[in-house]
C-alpha cells in the first residue's frame, strides 16, 4: 500500500540532497524551508491517495470535497431543516450552522474530526450514537446567545478504518434525523413530570450511596468531591473549582439531579458512556482552566427519576472513571 509513498519520499530526499550541495551557505535556511514544504506536500498527497473517498461518500450519504494541500477529505451539510433566529435575525446556515466531518489518512487507516450542529432534543441521541459506534465526543457547547431554538455543537474524533469511521459518522447523522422525523420542531423540555416547587429529598440513602455526608438545604442535598491538580505550579483542589458535584432536588420519587464532573482526558469517554447508559443527559463538555496538570475536562449533566436511582447512576460514573480513588475527602 505504501510503496508509492516510500518511492516518492525517496526521490524527494535525493533531489533535496543534490539541491542542497549546489546552494550557497547564505541561503541554506530558505532552501531548508522550501525542501520541507515539498516533502510535506508529497507525504500529504501520497497518504491522501490511499483514502477511499468514494467509500466515505457512500457510507455518510454525502458528497465530500478533497483539500489536496492538506490531504483532507471533508463532508458537510447545512442544518436548514429548522429555522434558527439569533438576536431577532433569521440565520442562514452559511453563517455557522453547518455540520461537517473531515477525514485524513494515517498509517493505520484514517482520523476523523467533526462538528455536529444539534438542537437540544437531539444532543443525547447523537452523543449516544457517536459513543456506541467508537467515536470520541470531545466537546459540547454553544456558539451563540439569544438563539432560538437553542443550537448546540458536538465535536467528535476517531481513528481507525475508514469504513468504520464513516459508518459511525452516518449513525450520528441518522440519530438526529430520527429525532426530527418524530418531532419536526425541537422540543422545549425533557418531557418529564413536573417537579414540586418545595423539595423534600431524604439525605440518608444518598449519603450511604456516595459514602459521604452531603450538604442539605431546604430539602435539597448536594455532594462535592474535589480532585488535586496543579496550575502554574500552584496546588488546586475542591475549593478552587476542581471538583465533581451532584445536587438533588424534588422528592425521593420524583427528583432531579444536576452537576458537573471533573475528569481527565482518559476518563472522559467511559464516564460519558456510563451516564448516558443510565439515562443521564449530558448538557455541556468543556474546560474551565488553562495550563492545569493533569488536563481536566468538565462536563455538566441533568437527570430525572427517583433520587436513589439517580445517585447510583452518578456513582456508576465515579466507578467507571476510577474517580473514587482520586477524590479528596469531604469535611
Language model: regions and residue ranges:
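Short, Lys/Arg-enriched N-terminal segments with co-localized hydrophobic residues
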Residues: 4, 9-27
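Bacterial N-terminal signal peptides
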Residues: 35-45
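Acidic/proline-rich low-complexity IDRs
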Residues: 6-10, 38-39, 58-61
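Short intrinsically disordered, low-complexity segments
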Residues: 18, 24-27, 40, 130, ...
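Long, contiguous binding/interaction regions
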Residues: 49-123, 127-132, 136-150, 157-277, ...
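Bacterial N-terminal signal peptides that target proteins for export
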Residues: 27-37
Amino acid at each position: 500500500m505504501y510503496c508509492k509513498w516510500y518511492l516518492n519520499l525517496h526521490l524527494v530526499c535525493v533531489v533535496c540532497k543534490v539541491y542542497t550541495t549546489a546552494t550557497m551557505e547564505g541561503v541554506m535556511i530558505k532552501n531548508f524551508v522550501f525542501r520541507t514544504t515539498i516533502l510535506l506536500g508529497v507525504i500529504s498527497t501520497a497518504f491522501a491517495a490511499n483514502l477511499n473517498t468514494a467509500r466515505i461518500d457512500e457510507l455518510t450519504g454525502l458528497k465530500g470535497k478533497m483539500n489536496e494541500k492538506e490531504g483532507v477529505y471533508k463532508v458537510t451539510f447545512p442544518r436548514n431543516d429548522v429555522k434558527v433566529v439569533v438576536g431577532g435575525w433569521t440565520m442562514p446556515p452559511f453563517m455557522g450552522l453547518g455540520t461537517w466531518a473531515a477525514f485524513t489518512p494515517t498509517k493505520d487507516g484514517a482520523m476523523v474530526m467533526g462538528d455536529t450542529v444539534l438542537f437540544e432534543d437531539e444532543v443525547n441521541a447523537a452523543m449516544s450514537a457517536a459513543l456506541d459506534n467508537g467515536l470520541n465526543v470531545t466537546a459540547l457547547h454553544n456558539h451563540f446567545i439569544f438563539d432560538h431554538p437553542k443550537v448546540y455543537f458536538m465535536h467528535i474524533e476517531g481513528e481507525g478504518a475508514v469504513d468504520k469511521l464513516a459508518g459511525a459518522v452516518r449513525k450520528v447523522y441518522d440519530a438526529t434525523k430520527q429525532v426530527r422525523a418524530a418531532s419536526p420542531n425541537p422540543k422545549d423540555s425533557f418531557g418529564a413530570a413536573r417537579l414540586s416547587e418545595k423539595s423534600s429529598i431524604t439525605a440518608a440513602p444518598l449519603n450511604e450511596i456516595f459514602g459521604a455526608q452531603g450538604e442539605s438545604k431546604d430539602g435539597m442535598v448536594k455532594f462535592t468531591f474535589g480532585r488535586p491538580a496543579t496550575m502554574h505550579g500552584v496546588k488546586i483542589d475542591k475549593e478552587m473549582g476542581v471538583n465533581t458535584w451532584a445536587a438533588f432536588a424534588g422528592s425521593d420519587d420524583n427528583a432531579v439531579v444536576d452537576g458537573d464532573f471533573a475528569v481527565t482526558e482518559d476518563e472522559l469517554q467511559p464516564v460519558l458512556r456510563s451516564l448516558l447508559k443510565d439515562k443521564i443527559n449530558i448538557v455541556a463538555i468543556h474546560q474551565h482552566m488553562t495550563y492545569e496538570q493533569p488536563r481536566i475536562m468538565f462536563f455538566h449533566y441533568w437527570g430525572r427519576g427517583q433520587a436513589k436511582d439517580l445517585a447510583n447512576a452518578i456513582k456508576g460514573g465515579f466507578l467507571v472513571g476510577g474517580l473514587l480513588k482520586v477524590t479528596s475527602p469531604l469535611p
